[in-house]
């Protein structure tokens, strides 16, 4: 096999792996429903480019119809290349809106020089994006956070916030008006890096604002990358833990009624038997040799029909 052919096979496997990971996430959390208009938040980074690209490919083959509109927030950062995103989006034929809001000046005015601006900037950006989604009539807001982001947030909250809390793949905004989805929740960052190189997305640097990097998040990110190199499977196991929570074996009295425990009571996850070692779920083994057949999912609720986004569009007569 030639080097070129081998690389083509690897690229094809990567594309299929990402498509299945995003499709599984959408299916598991019922992220996309018939008739949805999804606002894809596009920053110009590798993650949001990949998100839009994969959603477009799923849109073309999915058994349901939904719309995509890309939205970028131009925060008037010095040196921001205003022409890059419109040129790219027009070249691929995706409807888009560029929202111009000078949050850069606001943040610089409020915070001291050299301080990390990410937190305040994020809050301002969120409010503007929510408003834009309402103006456009969008039913869902899609963000480009991936599996590594979710785990990093969990450790940040544990180490610095004293909370066992991560970043949900799907949430309702505090005012109840918006559904936010993260279709890349099952996707590895290293796969997104490879995909961005493969697709040659016109990446816009994320440090144009001149803000100091979030040191805490940087330390957590380095820790996760180090673990991934030294202990294969650890990242997958940790993410699996977020999907297999056992409240009766934690210490939150609001999640579980410890005070009401009585003899003879049978717990869903067992009492002392829950300490026995468990096997890691097979779906979190290395995905490089992933089965290309469509992944079946069990309905979460009997009354709700789950649509498999990975299924093909139904054929029409004469097709």
Swiss-Prot record:
Motif PP-loop motif, residue numbers: 43-48
Protein name, UniProt field: tRNA-cytidine(32) 2-sulfurtransferase
Record's subcellular location: Cytoplasm
Protein family membership: Belongs to the TtcA family.
Any one GO molecular function term: magnesium ion binding
GO CC annotations on file: cytoplasm
Organism: Neisseria gonorrhoeae (strain NCCP11945)
Biological processes per GO annotation: tRNA thio-modification
Assembly, per entry: Homodimer.
Alphabetic keyword roster: 4Fe-4S, ATP-binding, Cytoplasm, Iron, Iron-sulfur, Magnesium, Metal-binding, Nucleotide-binding, RNA-binding, Transferase, tRNA processing, tRNA-binding
Cofactor or coenzyme needed: Mg(2+); [4Fe-4S] cluster
Binding site for [4Fe-4S] cluster: 118, 121, 209
Gene3D superfamilies: HUPs
Role, per record: Catalyzes the ATP-dependent 2-thiolation of cytidine in position 32 of tRNA, to form 2-thiocytidine (s(2)C32). The sulfur atoms are provided by the cysteine/cysteine desulfurase (IscS) system.
């Amino acid at each position: 096999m030639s080097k070129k052919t081998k690389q083509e096979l690897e690229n094809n496997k990567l594309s299929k792996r990402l498509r299945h990971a995003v499709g599984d996430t959408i299916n598991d959390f019922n992220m996309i429903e018939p008739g949805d208009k999804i606002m894809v938040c596009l920053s110009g980074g590798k993650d949001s480019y990949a998100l839009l690209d994969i959603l477009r490919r799923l849109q073309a083959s999915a058994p349901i119809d939904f719309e995509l509109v890309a939205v970028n927030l131009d925060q008037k950062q010095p040196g921001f290349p205003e022409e890059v995103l419109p040129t790219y989006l027009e070249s691929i034929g995706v409807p888009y809106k560029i929202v111009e809001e000078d949050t850069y000046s606001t943040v610089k005015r409020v915070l001291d020089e050299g301080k990390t601006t990410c937190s305040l900037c994020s809050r301002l950006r969120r409010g503007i994006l929510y408003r834009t989604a309402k103006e456009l009539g969008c039913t869902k807001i899609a963000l480009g956070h991936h599996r590594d982001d979710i785990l990093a947030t969990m450790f940040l909250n544990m180490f610095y916030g004293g909370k066992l809390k991560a970043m949900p793949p799907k949430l309702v905004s505090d005012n109840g008006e918006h559904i936010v989805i993260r279709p890349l929740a099952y996707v590895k960052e290293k796969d997104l890096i490879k995909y961005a190189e493969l697709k040659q997305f016109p990446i816009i640097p994320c440090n144009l604002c001149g803000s100091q990097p979030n040191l805490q998040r940087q330390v957590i990110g380095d820790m996760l990358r180090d673990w991934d190199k030294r202990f294969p499977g650890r990242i997958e196991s940790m993410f699996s833990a977020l999907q297999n929570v056992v409240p009766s074996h934690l210490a939150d009295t609001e999640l579980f009624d410890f005070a009401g425990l009585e003899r003879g009571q049978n717990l869903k996850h067992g009492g002392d038997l829950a300490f026995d070692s468990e096997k890691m779920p097979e779906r979190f083994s290395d995905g490089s040799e992933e089965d290309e057949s469509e992944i079946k999912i069990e309905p979460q609720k009997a009354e709700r029909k789950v649509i498999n986004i990975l299924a093909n569009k139904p054929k029409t007569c004469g097709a």
